[in-house]
Amino acid sequence: MIEFDNLTYLHGKPQGTGLLKANPEDFVVVEDLGFEPDGEGEHILVRILKNGCNTRFVADALAKFLKIHTREVSFAGQKDKHAVTEQWLCARVPGKEMPDLSAFQLEGCQVLQYARHKRKLRLGALKGNAFTLVLREVSNRDDVEQRLIDICVKGVPNYFGAQRFGIGGSNLQGALRWAQTNTPVRDRNKRSFWLSAARSAFFNQIVAERLKKADVNQVVDGDALQLAGRGSWFVATTEELAELQRRVNDKELMITAALPGSGEWGTQREALAFEQAAVAEETELQTLLVREKVEAARRAMLLYPQQLSWNWWDDVTVEIRFWLPAGSFATSVVRELINTTGDYAHIAE
């Protein structure tokens, strides 16, 4: 399996270096649920600004404050401990009386808003995230500037970030040990992390191989194409290639890559043969995903950061703002800009 650091670049390997996250304020994430609280219901949505504490820790503290079980507090996604993040937590608190959440105190946290809501907030139930990043000690301003311009037009590979695989790739290593020994894994969290890492690594490898082609965004017979922003896909046929290519060029359609698992991958003919060849050597992990009944899925091959803008504070410091849909990684954008100094595998999705 290709290591994350060796995955193919869309815009070529960056010429310069830089520092990501010199301090937490250099990595700001604002969660976008895509909806507002209902104003009624047995749940309470709580918007929290936090710095220096992870999502699970805050959720447990909120449960203790409300005198409810930790399983009654949910969230749409994990946010990084080493960043300034704004996100929603959801607590199930039936009854007409509204707790005074302004009294909730936790170092590094501030309650910004809270309101009643009818439904539980489930993992993944968000529209996306807005990012404000500061890159420091940038060694090649001209190269970064040109890459930002190119990304506006061509996007970046929609790779799963290094953090998906754990510190030092520990989640992927765990999946491989599991596949090789066939020993039952009782810990549900480990099972989830390991299976997710395996499937994500397959996706990254397929995309990396596709990016080696001369025309990355060229539709081929049997490609699975996705309407931009949608989850469903359809298969390209030879007769439609010219029209489908026009729609891909207009960013109306996205070429997808496989998240292998049980069931059909979604591609056919030439595209399917390419994907199967890209991961043909990884038989043990493929067998594991099928055995554990992890359903195959699709994910867009490229990612187009929305509302992308930047401002150079000086010749070596740039602030970058953009919005990404849920499940995408800011570090996959940064990877196309600079060779980062330091390890960012701990950054949450």
Curated annotation (Swiss-Prot):
Chain ranges of the TRUD domain: 155-303
GO terms of molecular function: RNA binding; tRNA pseudouridine(13) synthase activity
Catalytic reaction equation(s): uridine(13) in tRNA = pseudouridine(13) in tRNA
EC number: 5.4.99.27
Keywords: Isomerase, tRNA processing
Sites where the protein binds substrate: 27, 129, 329
Active site per database record: 80
Matching InterPro entries: PsdUridine_synth_cat_dom_sf (IPR020103), PsdUridine_synth_TruD (IPR001656), PsdUridine_synth_TruD_CS (IPR020119), PsdUridine_synth_TruD_insert (IPR011760), TruD_catalytic (IPR042214), TruD_insert_sf (IPR043165), TruD_pseudoU_synthase (IPR050170)
Enzyme class: isomerase
Family: Belongs to the pseudouridine synthase TruD family.
HAMAP family: TruD
Protein's job: Responsible for synthesis of pseudouridine from uracil-13 in transfer RNAs.
Name the UniProt record assigns to this protein: tRNA pseudouridine synthase D
Organism: Escherichia coli O127:H6 (strain E2348/69 / EPEC)
Gene name linked to the record: truD
